[in-house]
């Protein structure tokens, strides 16, 4: 089935209507689920950045499910960090956690869910004597049963500041944050600056990690400029044992690596796949490995059509991501959505970066992430020049090493 824009918009509008109808019938859990579905649609297809209808519905659900305190006195240097999904080396959790620990205040970390994939982060929290961890129990979308519990947990802790690390569809958390006393200052940690998310109305300030996000939040999300704080982040270089590469990655092969959620390479008239095809067809010694989650259908179809079964290989999620970069030769940036953290890992490890974007999209160039204070150009605006550069990097080891060191020296943050 071909997903047309008209069909996507009709599904979105229908889901919003179902959310409103459920609310009017007092079925708040169901209303919240429809809100989250609508948010996921908007996030996946990325035609809007804010929806005040959904924001208003969340605020109304909050009023119906939470009894607010009449008086509240915050305690300074007491903070809450709310994490929707905790995974090591993903998002900006560890960066902000370390910053809050450095403030030497009391810290309550609230997590919707976590497992062994968050072992390093949990260890850091437990090692800090002033920190507590609270994991939500049951279904986090059960607003009727759990919203009041979470509200009471936060208010009883009496924080002065709340830091929100959310998913685009974190409707449950936002219903609680909407009800919090105004004495608590809410900071949104925006790890999804390129797409839609819920929560524009419940923040006091928003942390952006690059100028592009500042522009989107001001112009598209309609957030006041005075509330937007630019704070670049750095990759967390945890050591993990290398999990290895597929057997086809023999010593005579040049390993290109690419990574990020798979939606980042869909769209853009299929240009990412055209670039990959040109590189692999012109350079038989090259193999492309891709680490990331998402809908694999489009990638698998591309692999089968071009008989790339041993040359374009999906790795899934890799916790040893820094080791992956150490063992690859070249990093190929995603398109049409460029990944920030992956580019930083490449730069820190001295791997040359191949990045493309349209000339008119300079706000999305990766230079804003790894070369802020240096006059260096990494992003290509001509696909042909990029593939030519790829060929030279693949065939000339000395040049490849030189380019990797050059970008690290000129601007990559360590």
List where the protein language model places each region.
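Conserved catalytic-core segment of nucleotide-activated headgroup transferases in glycan assembly
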Residues: 89-100, 211-305, 314
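Acidic donor-binding loop of glycosyltransferase active sites
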Residues: 157-162, 326-339, 351
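A short, active-site helix/loop in glycosyltransferases that binds the activated sugar's phosphate group
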Residues: 35-51, 196-228, 301
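N-terminal subdomain of nucleotide-sugar transferases
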Residues: 2-131
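Short His-centered aromatic/hydrophobic patch
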Residues: 164-170
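Conserved active-site histidine-acidic residue motif and adjacent donor-binding/catalytic loop
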Residues: 140-147, 293-297, 312-324, 338-339
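Catalytic binding pocket for nucleotide-activated donors in carbohydrate/polymer assembly enzymes
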Residues: 334-401, 405-406, 410
């Amino acid at each position: 089935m071909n997903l047309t824009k008209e069909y996507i918009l009709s599904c979105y509008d229908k889901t919003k209507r179902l959310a409103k109808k459920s609310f009017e019938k007092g079925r708040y859990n169901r209303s919240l689920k429809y809100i989250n579905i609508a948010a996921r649609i908007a996030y996946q297809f990325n035609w809007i950045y804010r929806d005040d209808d959904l924001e208003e519905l969340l605020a109304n659900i909050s009023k119906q499910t939470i009894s607010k305190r009449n008086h509240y006195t915050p305690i300074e240097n007491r903070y809450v960090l709310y994490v929707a999904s905790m995974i090591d080396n993903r998002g900006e959790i560890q960066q902000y956690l370390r910053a809050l620990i450095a403030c030497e205040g009391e810290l309550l970390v609230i997590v919707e869910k976590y497992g062994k994939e968050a072992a390093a982060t949990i260890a850091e929290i437990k090692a800090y004597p002033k920190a507590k961890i609270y994991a939500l129990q049951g279904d986090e979308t059960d607003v009727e049963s759990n919203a009041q519990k979470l509200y009471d947990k936060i208010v009883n802790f009496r924080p002065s500041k709340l830091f929100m690390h959310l998913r685009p569809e974190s409707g449950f958390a936002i219903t609680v944050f909407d009800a919090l006393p105004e004495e608590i200052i809410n900071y949104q940690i925006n790890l999804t600056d390129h797409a839609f998310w819920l929560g524009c109305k419940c923040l006091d300030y928003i942390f952006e990690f690059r100028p592009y996000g500042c522009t989107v939040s001001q112009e598209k999300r309609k957030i006041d400029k005075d509330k937007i704080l630019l704070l670049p982040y750095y990759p967390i270089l945890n050591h993990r044992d290398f999990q290895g590469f597929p057997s086809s990655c023999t010593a005579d092969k040049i390993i290109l690596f690419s990574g990020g959620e798979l939606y980042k390479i869909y769209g853009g008239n299929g240009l990412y796949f055209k670039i990959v095809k040109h590189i692999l067809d012109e350079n038989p010694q090259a193999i492309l490995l891709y680490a990331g989650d998402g809908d694999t259908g489009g990638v698998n179809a591309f692999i089968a059509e071009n008989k790339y079964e041993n040359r374009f290989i999906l790795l899934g999620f890799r916790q040893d991501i820094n080791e992956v970069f150490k063992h690859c030769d070249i990093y190929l940036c995603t398109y049409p959505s460029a990944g920030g953290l992956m580019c930083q890992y490449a730069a820190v490890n001295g791997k040359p970066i191949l990045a493309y974007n349209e000339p008119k999209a300079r706000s999305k160039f990766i230079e804003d992430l790894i070369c802020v204070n240096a006059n260096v150009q990494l992003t290509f605006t001509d696909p042909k020049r990029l593939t030519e550069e790829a060929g030279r990097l693949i065939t000339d080891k000395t040049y490849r090493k030189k380019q990797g060191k050059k970008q690290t020296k000129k601007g990559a943050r360590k």
